């Protein structure tokens, strides 16, 4: 029984693809990283009582933690340049104040980068950063990022839904 060369190559590529999928899905391999899965919309989360519009335009409110990612459309996974991200978090004393609020704009490739302190837990809540994302022709999204405590950086890709 002799197999042709193209069939062997195809079978080998299938085996490699299956192995790669298994390696990529190993627990802990991407700890602290949240990727946009097939452009499924990012989950909404509570706005909370501490949101205030008019946050200062800046890319950092502290040191020790970096949150970065890309804003994409759920329609076609295209990047969303110019998306406005408003972020707010508790300061080291567990309180919310203007020093820990920021607004920034995703660049031409939809990318954003935000520096802050690692937010503390408070009142039974785990450490978290609130985000409100808005862009022309898209529904506004309110979500939260939950940092992994022993990491100082995270990738948090965001997928927003076009307006109807």
Show which residues each predicted segment covers.
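Bacterial N-terminal signal peptides
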Residues: 13-24
């Amino acid at each position: 029984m002799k197999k042709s060369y193209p069939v062997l190559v195809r079978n080998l590529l299938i085996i490699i693809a299956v192995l790669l999928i298994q390696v990529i899905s190993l627990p802990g391999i991407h700890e602290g990283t949240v990727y946009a899965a097939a452009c499924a919309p990012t989950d909404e989360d509570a706005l909370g009582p501490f949101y205030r519009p008019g946050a200062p335009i800046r890319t950092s409110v502290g040191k020790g933690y970096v949150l970065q990612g890309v804003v994409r459309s759920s329609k076609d996974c295209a990047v969303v340049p110019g998306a406005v991200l408003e972020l707010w978090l508790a300061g080291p004393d567990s309180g919310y104040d203007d020093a820990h609020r920021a607004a920034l704009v995703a660049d031409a490739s939809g990318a954003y980068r935000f520096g802050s302190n690692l937010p503390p837990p408070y009142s039974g809540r785990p450490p978290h950063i609130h985000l409100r994302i808005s862009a022309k022709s898209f529904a506004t999204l309110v979500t939260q990022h939950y940092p992994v405590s022993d990491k100082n950086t995270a990738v948090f890709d965001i997928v927003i839904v076009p307006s109807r």
